[in-house]
Amino acid sequence: MKFCVAVSLLIIASMAGVISVSGYDVYPRDYAENYYYCGVRKDPDCSKICKLHGARVGYCHVKRCSCVDLPEKNQNFLSVIWKHC
């Protein structure tokens, strides 16, 4: 019974974006360490932002751009720029 509750909480937390499971639902950050927000007035194209960070694809999740298979080292914008210099 306790195991089922623990697994259920883990699934809910991963779906809500509280924790990251195997690189899924990772939020990229801009040069000022802020998240890319979406779902308000001017929506950034999350897929383009995530591809700039080296992820496969991106989407809007809980008003923040979320990337699929985003490498941890590319989560910050400046680390991506530094790699290309």
UniProtKB/Swiss-Prot annotation:
GO terms for molecular function: sodium channel inhibitor activity; toxin activity. Residues 24-85 form the LCN-type CS-alpha/beta domain. Keywords: Disulfide bond, Neurotoxin, Secreted, Signal, Toxin. InterPro entries: LCN-type_CS_alpha_beta_dom (IPR044062), Scorpion_toxin-like_sf (IPR036574), Scorpion_toxinL/defensin (IPR002061). Residues 1-23 form the signal peptide. Expressed by the venom gland. The keyword Disulfide bond applies. It comes from the Eukaryota. It is found in: Secreted. Its main location: secreted. Disulfide bonds join 38-60, 46-65, 50-67. Gene3D superfamilies: Knottin, scorpion toxin-like. PROSITE patterns: LCN_CSAB. GO terms for cellular component: extracellular region. Has the structural arrangement of an alpha-helix connected to antiparallel beta-sheets by disulfide bonds (CS-alpha/beta). Belongs to the long (3 C-C) scorpion toxin superfamily. This is Neurtoxin 10. It comes from Lychas mucronatus.
